Amino acid sequence: MDSIISAASVIAAGLAIGLAAIGPGIGQGNAAGQAVEGIARQPEGENKIRGTLLLSLAFMEALTIYGLVVALALLFANPFNG
């Protein structure tokens, strides 16, 4: 029974980190592309656009870090293992 729980935990950890990285990865790509496009259209707003971009990228990256925390909890502090 413990081997099944361990195997399921490893699979769940892989899915957690993989799925947690898909959304923010796509979002970061779109945000960076739109920021470059906005700076190209209005070069005088570069500082404001860059600041907003960096803040939004940090929030998006936090989602991936939450997935990493869940994966590490499943691997090393598994509440289902006795």
Swiss-Prot record:
InterPro entries: ATP_synth_csu_bac/chlpt, ATP_synth_F0_csu, ATP_synth_F0_csu_DDCD_BS, ATP_synth_F0_csu_sf, ATPase_proteolipid_c-like_dom, F/V-ATP_Csub_sf
Keyword GTP-binding annotated: no
Keyword Methyltransferase carried by entry: no
Subcellular location: Plastid, Chloroplast thylakoid membrane
Source organism, top-level taxon: Eukaryota
A single cellular component GO annotation: proton-transporting two-sector ATPase complex, proton-transporting domain
Family annotation (Pfam families): ATP-synt_C
Site features described as Reversibly protonated during proton transport, chain residue numbers: 61
Protein's membrane topology: Multi-pass membrane protein
Function: F(1)F(0) ATP synthase produces ATP from ADP in the presence of a proton or sodium gradient. F-type ATPases consist of two structural domains, F(1) containing the extramembraneous catalytic core and F(0) containing the membrane proton channel, linked together by a central stalk and a peripheral stalk. During catalysis, ATP synthesis in the catalytic domain of F(1) is coupled via a rotary mechanism of the central stalk subunits to proton translocation.
Quaternary structure note: F-type ATPases have 2 components, F(1) - the catalytic core - and F(0) - the membrane proton channel. F(1) has five subunits: alpha(3), beta(3), gamma(1), delta(1), epsilon(1). F(0) has four main subunits: a(1), b(1), b'(1) and c(10-14). The alpha and beta chains form an alternating ring which encloses part of the gamma chain. F(1) is attached to F(0) by a central stalk formed by the gamma and epsilon chains, while a peripheral stalk is formed by the delta, b and b' chains.
Note: In plastids the F-type ATPase is also known as CF(1)CF(0).
PANTHER family: ATP SYNTHASE LIPID-BINDING PROTEIN, MITOCHONDRIAL (PTHR10031), ATPASE PROTEIN 9 (PTHR10031:SF0)
Family from the record: Belongs to the ATPase C chain family.
Listed name of the protein: ATP synthase subunit c, chloroplastic
Species of the source: Trieres chinensis
